[in-house]
A protein has these predicted regions:
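Short helix-capping segments at alpha-helix termini
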Residues: 79-83, 180-185, 224-227, 293-297, ...
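Short linear loop/turn motifs
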Residues: 88, 96, 192, 235-236, ...
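Short, low-complexity disordered leader/linker segments with a strong preference
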Residues: 1-53, 363-377
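Short, glycine-/small- and polar/acidic-enriched structural segments
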Residues: 33-194, 199-204, 208-215, 234, ...
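Conserved C-terminal helix/tail region of periplasmic/extracytoplasmic solute-binding proteins
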Residues: 328-377
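Pocket-lining segment of extracytoplasmic ligand-binding domains
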Residues: 116, 197-200, 206-296
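Secondary-structure end/capping motifs
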Residues: 257-343
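Surface-exposed patches in mature extracellular/periplasmic domains of secreted proteins
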Residues: 90, 129-131, 190, 276-286, ...
Length: 377
């Protein structure tokens, strides 16, 4: 009898273990909680079997930064999955390189500017790329100096030494900027360096000013110990060159073959953008969490995102037309300026580089009301 009781007790324990194992397995198959990393989401749509989703390969313009918050948020919250897409991304190595790789078909979509794309299209007419949405309404093209250099207006650049990498977009457009502000471009002595050394050359006094993106240069200068009031910034957009910033680019042949995929991507991306505008701190935190290297400087990324929020993402034009759109007259003027600045032989029109047919209805890409926008902290 004692042995029978012992065996029954053993069976009870066995079935109890089986029940626990089944319970544990059931719990393990539930939707993951949002952790801020790519692919994680509190949205059940994000857990859709990837076999049912269309893979979309995306390249960034450079290293992942806080400017990529709309993309990361849209991934995390399952917005792309809801549209039937499985989005993966890789870092870029500069706008021109990103466009080149897009043109070869290595990626399906990319974040870069239309102006370098114009130059690429002229050289590669059979691999043409087009912009399907504007993500930055104002370009961060700028010439930057330090107050200690005594350059207080653009005209003070006459006869100075400027520095930038050879392929830098703002450097290539500098003659147009010079024409607008009354600087003789022939009086400028250019020093060429690697992109990572640009701010170092300025800090060390090897150059009087640099050309580049304010979103890259200003965070680097602040990280090096400079204060905002120490930095002088001359934006091209404030000096006669009203360029758009980065866009969502696709290969023209891909867009024609996959119009619904492009539309789905753009729609989900701007849902992410709307969330970032509403809560930029959450967007910043999502990017920091997605950084697998864990080397990202949160303060520098905060500065970068703050610049974008104040002057690139939301402008009077975006408030009027919604995210993603482009003003035809403004864009054509900047295309013409690019043709002159880059020395292009062709004379492209807006339709040759930008299409709004992939944008969602205007009501789906409106700027959130000011009352719904939290400050960046």
């Amino acid at each position: 009898m004692i042995h029978r009781k012992a065996s029954l007790k053993g069976l009870s324990r066995f079935f109890l273990l089986l029940a626990c194992a089944a319970l544990f397995t059931g719990c393990a198959t539930q939707s993951p909680t949002a952790s801020g990393g790519p692919g994680s989401s509190a949205n059940p749509a994000a857990t859709t079997d990837k076999k049912d989703l269309k893979d979309v390969r995306v390249q960034l313009s450079f290293l992942m930064q806080s400017l990529d918050a709309p993309l990361i948020v849209a991934i995390n919250k399952g917005y792309f999955a809801e549209e039937g897409l499985n989005v993966s991304f890789e870092r870029g190595f500069g706008n021109a390189d990103t466009i080149s790789k897009l043109g070869t078909g290595k990626f399906d979509m990319a974040f870069s500017d239309m102006y370098n794309a114009l130059e690429f299209n002229e050289k590669n007419p059979n691999d043409k790329v087009i912009a399907v949405a504007v993500t930055q309404n104002k370009a961060p093209f700028a010439v930057l100096s330090l107050k200690e250099r005594g350059i207080s207006s653009p005209k003070d650049l006459n006869g100075k030494k400027l520095g930038a990498p050879a392929g830098d977009g703002p450097r290539k457009l500098f003659p147009l900027f010079a024409q607008e502000v009354g600087v003789d471009p022939k009086s400028i002595e250019w020093t060429t360096m690697e992109p990572k050394l640009r701010e170092t050359f300025l800090l060390q006094g090897k150059v009087d000013a640099i050309s580049g993106f304010s979103t890259s240069a200003i965070p680097s200068l602040l990280k090096a110990g400079k204060k905002p009031e120490d930095i002088t910034t001359f934006y091209y957009t404030e000096n006669g060159l009203d360029f758009y910033g980065n866009t969502i680019l696709v290969k023209d042949s891909f867009a024609k073959a996959n119009p619904e995929v492009v539309k789905a991507f753009v729609k989900a991306y701007f849902r992410g953008m709307q969330d970032v505008i509403k809560d930029p701190t959450a967007g910043l935190d999502a990017v920091i969490a997605a950084d697998q290297s864990k080397l990202m400087d949160r303060q520098a990324e905060k500065v970068r995102l703050d610049i974008a929020l104040k002057s690139m993402y939301v402008t009077p034009e975006v408030e009027k037309n919604g995210f993603g759109a482009a003003d035809t007259a403004r864009l054509q003027e900047t295309i013409d300026q690019t043709v002159a600045g880059f020395g292009l032989k062709s004379k492209p029109q807006v339709a040759d580089i930008f299409s709004d047919q992939f944008l969602p209805p205007k009501e789906q890409r409106q700027v959130p009301p000011a009352a719904e926008r939290k400050p960046l902290s």
